[in-house]
Amino acid sequence: MSKNLEKLPNTIWILAAGLLCVGAGQSIVFITIPPIARDLGLNEIQIGSIFATSALAWMILSPIWGSLSDSVGRKKIVIVGLLGFAVSLILFSFTISLGQRELLTGSLLFLLLVAARVLNGIFGSATRPSSGGWVADISSTESRSRAFARLDSGFSMGRILGPAVAGLLLLVSYTAPFFFFATGAFIVIIFVTFQKSPAKFSSKETIKKLSMFDSRVWPFLIVSAGFGISNAALVQTSSFFFQDVITPSSDNYIALASIGFMLSALGVLNGQLLIADRLQTSPGSLVKLGVILNFFALTGYAFSTSLVEVYICLFFYGLGGGMLGPGISSSLSLSVGKEYQGAAGGFLGMVIPVGHVISPLVSMPLYMLSPSLPYLLGASLMFFAMIFIFTNKRHKWIRDKNYREDRNLEVFENSQ
């Protein structure tokens, strides 16, 4: 490698640890709550409502928290986000415990579970945009994709560790995994407290509010939303795909699907920490390569008929997603001015859950028509994303690295 790696501040790893706790907490909820809630007497519609209300709150509040971090400072919003996330996990766990003891039942139990998850959506949505703004503040334009790759690797690692740790702690109690990662969030808060927050952006001029329809913003949100829908369709139907198509004669289809998603997560980490971070791949190249890989991986997945084929496709799908995530984050960060870093991250946090809201309405009916259709839908979205990024002027601006000449994008002074 011809150029030396620029040393990035350790603060990024601390912020990544916070996202690890958030990612682990989210994955634990997705895995454990459906069977637990069913045991508590809740039906499928109620269980779906618990998830949907949280996602809706996340979508609404994420851009608000991002803008607030621009004006009141990153550290305050990061701490508020982690604190609210930890408290919501504890309240959720406590409500489940009361339900298992039959001290809460029926509608009251359901409403309290919804309230706890809404609290998670309200405050948990603060962590990613404020952390992303912080990372942008303390990284140069040349190292921006590396910095975001490290930050996003925390959430990815949480998605891996969450189910693994939950599998062990569930032997202790149903609520132990929630308390474990809530405690982890409290510990991260302590470390964040001792980090020197970047200087707030100040200007004698009135700063115009950033719009998600700004030409510097929406081209990256479009690609992110397409990836989110593709990813949600894959995640929400793959267990059925393994059961119906790949291993129809096996009773271990859930375990086999879990192995596939572990391989996908391994691909994500390779995309983030090897290709984006270690190899210093530029943001524009990360987006381009990520979309292309996802297109071929989803197409291959749709026509797979064996475990080997599916596992290969899932690994390369994860690899593409691991490049696309930090590629979009760093591209959007470089596309807007330094006074809009939190707001831009907030918009990105708003569109990421879109897939989990839209996909159930589309992917399940498509799967009923043909098991391959949800993945062909995702491949189609990635195909159109390829055309878009090669024709859109702002994506070309990023690929040509014109942000190097934009004096408005100078990094904040790093006092680490």
Please report, for each region that a protein language model flagged, where it lies by residue.
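Central cavity-lining transmembrane alpha-helices of secondary-active solute carriers
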Residues: 49-67, 259-274
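Hydrophobic core of transmembrane alpha-helices in multi-pass small-molecule transporters
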Residues: 20, 101-126, 225, 309-323
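Helix-loop boundary and gating motifs at the non-cytosolic
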Residues: 6-55, 219, 223, 228-247
